[in-house]
């Protein structure tokens, strides 16, 4: 964000505000990788677009799409993978649109059909390391609906241990306590 925007910004708990002039992008990335940083970081700079391009250049970009799917009972489709609650999502195939990928991934990961794609809810970014490469994953999140009444079937070869329908109350009481911050943000926008 620019200095003018930063002057009006109130940082939430665990968010650190840094100046681009005080640390290089590489130093910032090393700090994030070491785990010795705040939960969130806001970078103040004169040219946010240029800073973003420099940040993205440090990673291999991966693009994914997923959905917040509601059934006819207004329950939300969730998955449990690698010890966390999550939403179904996955990488785009070559020449596939984010919306088409979201529908395909939900169907593959949960065995649910009759999906209707709704509007784009949110776009998130998160980083991880895979085979010693730094990955920046951009995920498009869509609102979706289904009339499929079948019980979800988890895609075990994707390490999905469970796929189930939760009420909004269950999402707030169970899901939110054990999920990723970016996924929680997506669901909060959808509820």
Per-segment meaning from a language model:
Residues 92-181:
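Unchanged
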Residues 7-18, 70-107, 112:
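Conserved Nudix-box catalytic region and its N-terminal flanking loop in Nudix hydrolases
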Residues 182-191:
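Charged phosphate-binding loop/patch that engages nucleotide di/tri-phosphates or the phosphate backbone
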Residues 69-72, 144-146:
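Active-site beta-strand termini and strand-to-loop segments that position acidic
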Residues 1-34:
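N-terminal leader/capping segments at the start of a protein or of a new domain
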């Amino acid at each position: 964000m620019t200095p003018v925007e930063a002057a009006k910004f109130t940082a939430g708990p665990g968010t650190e505000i840094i100046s681009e002039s005080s640390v290089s992008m590489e130093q910032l990335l090393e700090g994030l990788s070491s785990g010795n940083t705040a939960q969130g970081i806001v970078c103040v700079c004169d040219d946010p677009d240029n800073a973003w391009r420099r940040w993205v250049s440090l990673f291999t970009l991966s693009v994914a799409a997923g959905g917040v799917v509601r059934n006819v009972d207004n329950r939300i489709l969730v998955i449990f993978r690698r010890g966390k609650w999550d939403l179904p999502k996955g990488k785009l195939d070559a020449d596939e649109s984010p919306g088409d990928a979201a529908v395909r991934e939900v169907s593959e990961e949960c065995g649910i059909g009759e999906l209707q794609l709704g509007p784009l809810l949110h776009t998130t970014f998160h980083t991880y390391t895979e085979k010693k490469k730094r990955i920046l994953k951009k995920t498009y999140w869509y609102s979706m609906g289904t009339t499929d009444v079948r019980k979800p079937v988890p895609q075990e070869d994707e390490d999905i241990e469970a796929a189930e329908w939760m009420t909004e109350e269950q999402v707030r009481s169970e899901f939110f306590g054990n999920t990723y911050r970016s996924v929680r943000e997506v669901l909060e926008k959808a509820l």
